[in-house]
Amino acid sequence: NIVSTLKEATIKDLDDNFISLDNFEYKKDTNIFKSVGKILLKDKNQNSYEFSQIYINEKKKEIIGSNAKAFLNQEDFKIDKKNKPRIFSNTINLKENDTKFIKSAFTICNYRENDKCPPWELLASEIRHNKKNKTVYYDNAIIKIYDIPIFYLPFLAHPDPSVKRRSGFLNPSFSDTKNLGASINLPYFWAIDND
């Protein structure tokens, strides 16, 4: 009850995800899919993920991958049209209502010479996105600007970009001027009323 190939293949699953890979093995009795090599997954929201190894459990609707690169093109994740949010991670665990990135780096900057965004990244031992309560959590977060650690936070949480109104920190902004040098602005929004 095993379906496998050692040739390049593209697969579309029941959730409209497309997976391009070098090889795969699928066990029909357990509904477990695995692959090692160059793997590209594109979901129905046009987010793309690259892996070197992937396991998919169809019964649990769970994807576990290693050496992951997530390029988030979904409008909910973008602060504005210029940003290209991405997360690089040792391990990723995608579930229906919860996504975990282990040993991760997150940024929205392009890292190009002419890019107006200073190269910054947020490193964390774990990043969790709870889709049900629309919150992103970070454990052991380090904010780096130009590869220099600026802040360490043992725990950080904020609403995901799809949330229109909730008390909490807003998206940080970074600037760099010749007179003042690099700076960070981290505004806090206080929702006095639920309306």
Located regions from the model:
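Structural signature for solvent-exposed beta-strand/loop edge elements and short helix-capping sites
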Residues: N1-D195
